[in-house]
Amino acid sequence: LNYVSLISGIATKTNNLIKKIGKKSKICCTRKTIPNLRVIQKYAVKLGGGTNHRFNLSDEYLIKDNHIASSNLKILVQKAILYKKGRKITVEVDNLNQLKSILGLDFTTVLFDNMSIKNLKLGVKLANKYYETEASGNITIKNVNSVARTGVDRISVGSITHSASAMDFKLEI
């Protein structure tokens, strides 16, 4: 019963986001799941109409802000390209200068993290010709439609899995 409550809460939260944006973008979950419940939580996202584009960090290279803090973004992307062995490469950027520094390199997806709607729209315009685009960071039911209207391909929402409220079910015998 607890699993059904959890799955229903995740599926409902996912579906509410999808209803808010229509078909403008895909709603995705992130890797941020409850330990040992990843499979069931990602299944619940699918039940709600969302997608799972990354199951875990072994699925693709994900270059994030903590990697960037220790090195040059362009060099990190170039190294990932050398070792990708058929895997996708997603590069997180949190400003337009970072994006501009890697345009033209052979990676798959730009992940715009915590960007303003204005900058997200500009970033999507710059990247859409070459890469898949994904928005992430502080996305809620209140702002998801504005994010979708930027033209981004995917919107990843960590709170779908790590903060969804379980539905209230009871079992009577």
Residue positions per predicted region:
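Acidic/glycine-rich phosphate/pyrophosphate-binding loops and surrounding catalytic core
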Residues: L1-L105, T109, K118-L126, Y130-A135, ...
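Short secondary-structure boundary segments
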Residues: N114, G137, S159
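Cys/His-rich Zn2+-binding cysteine-cluster or related metal-binding knuckle/ribbon modules and their
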Residues: I141
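Active-site loop ensemble at the mouth of alpha/beta enzyme cores that anchors a bound cofactor
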Residues: K170-I173
